[in-house]
């Protein structure tokens, strides 16, 4: 991408970006095109990060390991649901991912955890997500029992209207009372160390990012 195009794109994306300044947006655009590769300049080809490339970034850079959660994070970034992350989706997604307010992060995490998109986190959804985070003990007759117990404990803590599922209102109230519950069903945001390392590297020289 030539300098003029890059400058124009930077100006456009900075206008709609809450948490990055112009220099940071420029670095993230440069990184995006480094990750996408040569396809960027081909006419008629949709430019974007596909699911595999994006999941690799989540895994290698931000230490995420849960396939289900990584898939949901991809969907959270891919707002137009076209199967790849465009440069504007990349900037807006990272703005929240790295520097979002508590309100923004609550909305994002809830959408990640609401696996079927019906506006609630059901017992079944909790079970699926928590199952991946618990180690099975070989001595247990029914390893799912421990997970079912954990679901019940979580509901008791977070289900304020006692309807057997979590609405956003339930979730928000619980998280405001105890911030640690933000990622109650699995890590879907970077930990502070990964975030600092990513920002230090990318906002210094995005061209060296792949050497990390």
From Swiss-Prot:
Which GO molecular function annotations are given, in alphabetical order?
beta-tubulin binding; calcium ion binding; calcium-dependent outer dynein arm binding; cytoskeletal motor regulator activity; dynein heavy chain binding
Q: Which UniProt keywords apply?
A: Calcium, Cell projection, Cilium, Cytoplasm, Cytoskeleton, Flagellum, Metal-binding, Repeat
| Pfam families in alphabetical order | EF-hand_1, EF-hand_7
Q: What happens when the gene is disrupted?
A: Mice display typical phenotypes of primary ciliary dyskinesia, including hydrocephalus, situs inversus, and abnormal motility of trachea cilia and sperm flagella. Strikingly, both males and females are viable and fertile. The 9 + 2 axonemal structures of epithelial multicilia and sperm flagella are normal, but the formation of 9 + 0 nodal cilia is significantly disrupted.
Q: Does the keyword Cell membrane apply?
A: no
* The protein's role, per its UniProt record: Component of the outer dynein arm-docking complex (ODA-DC) that mediates outer dynein arms (ODA) binding onto the doublet microtubule. Seems to regulate the assembly of both ODAs and their axonemal docking complex onto ciliary microtubules. Regulates ciliary and flagellar motility and is required for cilia-driven determination of body laterality.
The name under which this protein is listed is: Calaxin
Q: Which organism is it from?
A: Mus musculus (Mouse)
Classification lineage: Eukaryota, Metazoa, Chordata, Craniata, Vertebrata
């Amino acid at each position: 991408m030539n300098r003029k195009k890059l400058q124009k794109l930077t100006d456009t994306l900075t206008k709609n970006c809450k948490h990055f300044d112009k220099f940071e947006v420029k670095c993230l655009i440069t990184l995006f095109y480094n990750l996408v590769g040569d396809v960027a300049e081909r006419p008629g080809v949709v430019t974007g990060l596909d699911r595999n490339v994006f999941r690799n970034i989540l895994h290698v850079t931000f230490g995420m390991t849960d396939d289900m959660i990584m898939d949901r994070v991809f969907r959270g970034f891919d707002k137009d649901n076209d199967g790849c992350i465009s440069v504007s989706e990349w900037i807006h997604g990272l703005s929240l991912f790295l520097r979002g307010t508590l309100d923004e992060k609550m909305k994002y995490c809830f959408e990640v955890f609401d696996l079927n998109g019906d506006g609630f986190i059901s017992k079944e959804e909790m079970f699926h997500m928590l199952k991946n985070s618990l180690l099975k003990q070989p001595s247990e007759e029914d390893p799912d029992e421990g997970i079912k117990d954990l679901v019940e404990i979580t509901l008791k803590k977070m289900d304020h209207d006692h309807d057997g599922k979590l609405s956003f209102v339930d979730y928000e109230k619980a998280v405001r009372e105890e911030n640690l519950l933000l990622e109650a069903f699995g890590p879907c945001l970077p930990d502070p160390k990964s975030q600092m390392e990513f920002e230090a590297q990318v906002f210094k020289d995005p061209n060296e990012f792949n050497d990390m």
